Amino acid sequence: SNYEVYDGTRNINVHNWTNTAQEQFSNPYWMLNRQKPVSYRNRYEFGGSVKYDIMEGLSVTGRLRYERGDETWNLNEYASSTAGRNLLGTMKDTRVNSEQTYGDLLAQYNKTWEDTYSLSVTAGGSYQKTKSSSLELIGWGDSQFSVNDAGVITSGAYYPNIFSPANYYKLQTTKTLAEKRLNSVFATAQFGYKEGLFIDVSARNDWSSTLAFTDGVSFFYPSVGASVLLDR
């Protein structure tokens, strides 16, 4: 459990391991206390639906749902964690945000005739929008802050184990943003005979933003099926 020892030449505690020059292995207690990732996640969901009966067997339903997720991931690697690459400590901070909005409008019709024939039809449309963004910030502490003969700052961190962006000259930032929209119309119908024979027909057409500015901006896919209940 004695995972760190004091280094008088650097005036900090460093990794206590049999071979500090290797990168593959570390003292497990050091990893637990000085290389431990921390993450936080929040998720929110809101939704609702409204249904209206127009007449017997015919109804209209509208639904709306919104979801949002926020996640933060931090990893602070103390000085001497990785041989040759962590002289003063490295800071990694990642933040991810995502949200989704979905809504649809459905018309449903159900009818039975003399317990012999049945018909069930659903038709409608839907809208879906997804959006995600991420920001990753890495402060490399692989070298001491220095200035070359020309007076130009080269790289490095100012002080060891100070995990703040202001402590690092060498910062790496990566930002991503993605957004997608999907609009759809669809219909499905089921014909039944004496509750033993069923024929299903469905069709759907989607318009996706991922296909924008292409020849095939939408795609259509129908289906037909049948089923028989032998005991009927």
Walk through the language-model features, giving the residues of each.
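Surface-exposed loop/interface segments of Gram-negative outer-membrane beta-barrel transport/assembly proteins
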Residues: 1-43, 63-183, 210-212, 219, ...
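Residues on the lipid-exposed face of transmembrane beta-strands in outer-membrane beta-barrel proteins
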Residues: 48-52, 105-109, 123, 187-193, ...
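Residue-level recognition of beta-strand termini and adjacent short loop/turns
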Residues: 55, 112-114, 194
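Transmembrane beta-strand segments that form the barrel wall of outer-membrane beta-barrel proteins
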Residues: 199-209, 230
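Exposed, low-structure sequence patches enriched in small/polar residues
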Residues: 182, 188-192, 202
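Amphipathic alpha-helical segments in well-structured domains
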Residues: 217-224
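Repeated loop/turn-to-beta-strand initiation elements of outer-membrane beta-barrel proteins
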Residues: 57-60, 117, 196-199
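Conserved C-lobe terminal segment of protein kinase catalytic domains
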Residues: 69, 194-196, 208
